């Protein structure tokens, strides 16, 4: 509850700062897609020291970035995932907002970009041991309309708002030509009760009224785009 309140407070403070200082960042000063203003070493390690006023999260989380340019050079299926790179790991509410407020949101990312937020030491790949037996829930949104849903998904995960939060590996937003998709990856696909609980709670967090489906990673690897939903809510 303390962390959840801190997340809400930080969000309110951020909005207030925006309203009192509406001058936009100069174009030349904007970070590149996926770029974080800060030390590159922090991409692979959670912060060691937590200031007394900081609010520690239950888990450390890492943002990962997969750019269209990097993916275009990968033509073989076995190369899938090799272009994904970590950009920052955070362990507190304050670190999260510091990062989130200094990176481009989904609506500002190039078409073809995949942007991930996964628990520390879990890679956003089917081959990762923690993800291997899992699956994913996916919501589809109109082009340029995923920013709020992406933020609420992040806050729901890092704020431990899911009853089966231990099942969650992370989330990814996929920016495409005509639409954007957000997916939550989970660990144990055959745990139907846990997956259905996550799907229902996620829809509630997003106030999303369309039906969403859950696909096993194993089926996605075998059948790719023709993989069928195993669960729906």
Swiss-Prot record:
Disruption phenotype: (Microbial infection) Not observable resistance to Plum pox virus (PPV) strain D. Residues 1-51 are annotated as: Disordered. It holds the Pfam family IF4E. One of its GO terms (cellular component) is eukaryotic translation initiation factor 4F complex. Residues 55-58, 65-104, 152-161 are annotated as: EIF4G-binding. Its main location: nucleus. Mostly expressed in leaves, flower buds, leaf buds and anthers, to a lower extent in roots, stems and green immature fruit, and, at low levels, in petals. Gene3D superfamilies: RNA Cap, Translation Initiation Factor Eif4e (3.30.760.10). SUPFAM superfamilies: eIF4e-like (SSF55418). MRNA binds at residues 76-81, 108, 126-127, 176-181, 221-225. It is found in: Nucleus; Cytoplasm. It comes from the Eukaryota. Disulfide bonds join 131-169. According to the redox status, the Cys-131-Cys-169 disulfide bridge may have a role in regulating protein function by affecting its ability to bind capped mRNA. One of its GO terms (molecular function) is translation initiation factor activity. Component of the protein complex eIF4F, which is involved in the recognition of the mRNA cap, ATP-dependent unwinding of 5'-terminal secondary structure and recruitment of mRNA to the ribosome. Recognizes and binds the 7-methylguanosine-containing mRNA cap during an early step in the initiation of protein synthesis and facilitates ribosome binding by inducing the unwinding of the mRNAs secondary structures. This is Eukaryotic translation initiation factor 4E-1. It comes from Prunus domestica (Garden plum). The gene is eIF4E.
């Amino acid at each position: 509850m303390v962390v959840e309140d801190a997340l809400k407070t930080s969000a309110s403070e951020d909005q207030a700062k925006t309203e009192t200082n509406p001058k936009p960042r100069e174009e030349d000063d904007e970070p590149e897609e996926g770029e974080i203003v800060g030390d590159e070493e922090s991409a692979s390690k959670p912060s060691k020291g937590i200031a007394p006023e900081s609010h520690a999260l239950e888990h450390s989380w890492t943002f990962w970035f997969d750019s269209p340019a990097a993916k275009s050079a990968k033509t073989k299926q076995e190369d899938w995932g090799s272009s994904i790179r970590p950009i920052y790991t955070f362990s507190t509410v304050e670190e999260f907002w510091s990062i989130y407020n200094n990176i481009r949101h989904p609506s500002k990312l190039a078409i073809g970009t995949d942007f991930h937020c996964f628990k520390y030491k879990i890679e956003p790949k089917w081959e990762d041991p923690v993800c291997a037996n899992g699956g994913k829930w996916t919501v589809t949104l109109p082009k340029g309309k995923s920013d709020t849903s992406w933020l609420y998904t992040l806050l729901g995960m890092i704020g431990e708002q899911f009853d089966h939060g231990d099942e969650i590996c992370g989330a990814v937003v996929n920016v495409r030509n005509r639409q954007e998709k957000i997916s939550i990856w989970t660990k144990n696909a055959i745990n139907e009760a846990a997956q259905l609980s996550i799907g229902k709670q996620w829809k509630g967090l997003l106030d999303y009224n369309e039906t969403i489906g859950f696909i096993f990673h194993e089926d996605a690897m075998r059948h790719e785009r023709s993989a069928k939903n195993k669960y729906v809510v």
